[in-house]
């Protein structure tokens, strides 16, 4: 079965949405459209554009020490950290830098952090960034893991 991708323009010239109409099922939900963000997760110019838009919500009121990247969003997470540490941003963390981390998962899909990553979570303000939040279960699990390891969700 061939799927047709719809390319939708946005207000940003270097950023577009790619959507596929159909029936898509996960273990917890069913959807009629799939928004493909593969390019945004992989292409630096699009990742930078997304990060710039996202950071505008966090510029003056949120402390971010660590970006927790879910669903392969490390490129965007790195761009978010870059935006948050630019000179025109009032960075509230002590080292003027931001950690970018990804979790590991147990065989039961529980999120865990190895001993070498725990210091980047414990006592830190952690921004959780996910490619998709359909039911909220993954976001909830990530927030619980951050709190379990002694971090605060930003």
Language model features: what each stretch is:
Residues 1-154:
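PRPP-associated nucleotide enzymes
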